[in-house]
């Protein structure tokens, strides 16, 4: 049996011919080159992959693709690109940003979820083709997910929050800003399964009422950051329940919540000593 060396099998090392070996390849062992490549960004890795056959294998090794941010290429990223990346990276990938990638939809993200089950941080901010089907896939395959950004994914509904609650119990940060189909029922389902939430961004979720905040206050004692900007139906009553249940709160944004009065300041002072 050929032993693995940092995810690259010995047989793959043996494929390098003498004619393919530059001086640096002869001086440095393949294991060290692989380690060096692990510090490079996506663009540099792709350039290295074109240098030689040896570097192609090393640069494209899945262990080098644990953190990928494709925002700079958002106009060029289509579903097939995400599928190919997920197949190459597999279980190595921990963090992926597809922010602003309008061409990525549910089918590609299902393939991604199936292949990248160790994903911990995922940004789909502005991926407007994303629907509840994507959250169902994440729930089914990505139980290690900790941070999820679904801001401006306006097709997201309560069904997504229910799915995340059932399959992503480690979730600590969720951004569903401008997902204006979400109601108190979705929040109720979410917090019952994701009680470890530390940051929740609900900016522009205009259907949320005080009852949604009561669920958060009752089930999210670890909450540190809460953004309720322009949640127009929120009143003092709802925010007071947050103050009483979320004593670790450090950041609260209620800008544009016109039904809030000075009474909330007293509740914050008494119950949230860490507020900045």
Curated annotation (Swiss-Prot):
GO biological process, one term: regulation of protein catabolic process at presynapse, modulating synaptic transmission
Domain F-box: 22-68
Tissue expression as described in the entry: Widely expressed, with highest expression in skeletal muscle, heart and brain.
One GO term describing the cellular component: synapse
PROSITE patterns: FBOX
Domain of life, source organism: Eukaryota
Keywords annotated in UniProt: Cytoplasm, Leucine-rich repeat, Repeat, Ubl conjugation pathway
Xref: SMART domains: FBOX (SM00256), LRR_CC (SM00367)
Placement of LRR repeats on the sequence: 74-100, 101-126, 127-152, 153-178, 179-204, 205-230, 231-256, 257-276
Disulfide bonds: none
PANTHER family in UniProt: F-BOX PROTEIN YLR352W, PARTNER OF PAIRED, ISOFORM B-RELATED
Name of protein: F-box/LRR-repeat protein 20
């Amino acid at each position: 049996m050929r032993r693995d060396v940092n995810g690259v099998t010995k047989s793959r090392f043996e494929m390098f011919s003498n004619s393919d070996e530059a001086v640096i390849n002869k001086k440095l062992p393949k294991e060290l080159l692989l380690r060096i490549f692990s510090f490079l960004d996506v663009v540099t890795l792709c350039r290295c992959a074109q240098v030689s056959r040896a570097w192609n294998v090393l640069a494209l090794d899945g262990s080098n693709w644990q953190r990928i941010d494709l925002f700079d290429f958002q106009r060029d990223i289509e579903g097939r690109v995400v599928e190919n990346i997920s197949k190459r990276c597999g279980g190595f990938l921990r963090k992926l940003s597809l922010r602003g990638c309008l061409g990525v939809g549910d089918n590609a993200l299902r393939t991604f979820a199936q292949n990248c089950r160790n994903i911990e941080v995922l940004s789909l901010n502005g991926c407007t083709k994303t629907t509840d089907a994507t959250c169902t896939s994440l729930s089914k395959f990505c139980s290690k997910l900790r941070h999820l950004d679904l801001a401006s994914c306006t097709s997201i509904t309560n069904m997504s929050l229910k799915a995340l609650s059932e399959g992503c119990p480690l979730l600590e940060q969720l951004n569903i800003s401008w997902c204006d189909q979400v109601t108190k029922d979705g929040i109720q389902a979410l917090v019952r399964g994701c009680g470890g939430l530390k940051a929740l961004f609900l900016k522009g979720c205009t259907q949320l009422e005080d009852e949604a905040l009561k669920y958060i206050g009752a089930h999210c004692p670890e909450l540190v950051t809460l953004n309720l900007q322009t949640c127009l139906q929120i009143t003092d009553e709802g925010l007071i329940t947050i103050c009483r249940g979320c004593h670790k709160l450090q950041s609260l944004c209620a800008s544009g919540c016109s039904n809030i009065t000075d009474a909330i300041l007293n509740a914050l002072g008494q119950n949230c000593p860490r507020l900045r």
